[in-house]
Amino acid sequence: LALDLGTTGNRAFLFDNSGNVISQAYQELTQYYPQPGWLEHNPLEIWQATCTVMQKAIQQAKIKATDIQAIGLTVHRETCLLWDKTTGQPLHNAIVWQDRRTAFHCQKLQEQGYAEEIFVRTGLIIDAYFSATKLTWLLEQVVKPSSINLDNVLDGTIDSWILWNLTGGKVHATDDSNASRTMLYNLTTREWDTKLLDLFNIPAHLLPKIQPTLGYFGTTKPDLLGAEIPITAILGDQQASLFGHGCDRPGLVKCTYGTGSFLVARTGNNIIHSQQQLIATIAWTQNNSNDTTKVGYALEGSMFTTGACIQWLRDGIGLIDNAAQTEMLAQQVSDNGGVYFVPALSGLGAPHWDMNARGAFFGITGGVKRQHLVRSVLEAIAFQVKEVVQAINDSGLLQVERLKVDGG
């Protein structure tokens, strides 16, 4: 049973022993925008949707829970929350990876000269995208003004929250791939970095235990599905895509087109600190039989709004009725009519990392039609990916040998 917990919805897939999908289920998630630039999810809705898709997939497959050999979990990364370990209740909505509320905090850290140290320790560029400043905000804005006892609080990314619920509160853990996206994880030691915990004022006891990506994370509580099913893999969604494409050596690269687009290049056993504004991250880790851990690294270019731009064309300004319409409209004109779109609806990610950038259309004249605007948005998505591929090649440390593509 594979659980794919995405930004816009949760999916469950059941595979047979030959790797064929025998059933699947999907449930959309509500997106909450309390202020411009903010995005939240209801953690209880995420958990309930997870339960729903698991049960639907099992029912559709007409199997028993005892037939399921193992559960694997992949999640959208960086999104994080706090919850009460006694009641199991979230203390606030989860702050989603696209949320920009902590941009000012990030700018302050840059001005104070922390950029290089954080880059060396974590492989990441200071940005509101990552979890650290989100957790600081939650502690300062939710916990500090209240009478909440910090000894009763747990924090984590979505994988930790779902794992904790799957196991009935028995396991508070994460894997290396998700931990490496928090800006609190030391990429070299593969542990929570005490200096960064102090910098972000995050008590160490709140954090989940870091475990290898492919290993043992406990079992589901018996009354959840009707059996104790072992949980044997947890990955960040983009690392899961890299694994699924078989990108197991340097030069193999994948690009996923979803809410955002994420281009990830396997770098083998080496941490590559790119000077081209790309981030270093864990690909995945695995338990060896001799109690050692096999570690793989990757280089990533994160582009925040690609599919989200198409969603905005539909829901925000009503230029299209559905996503499929974009191709038809784009093909009705021979070029973009001189119109260019900046896809910075949530700032710009790699290779620019500009939290203050905003989306814009340029080159509009009286002859521009709806088709030109739609085409310029599609072209902007392609231009972003080209920039990141070029940045990888320009690093001089890695050449893109093969690029694999998926979407969701």
PLM segments and residue spans:
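N-terminal glycine/serine-rich phosphate-binding loop of ATP-dependent small-molecule kinases
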Residues: L1-H92, F104, V120, L225-A233
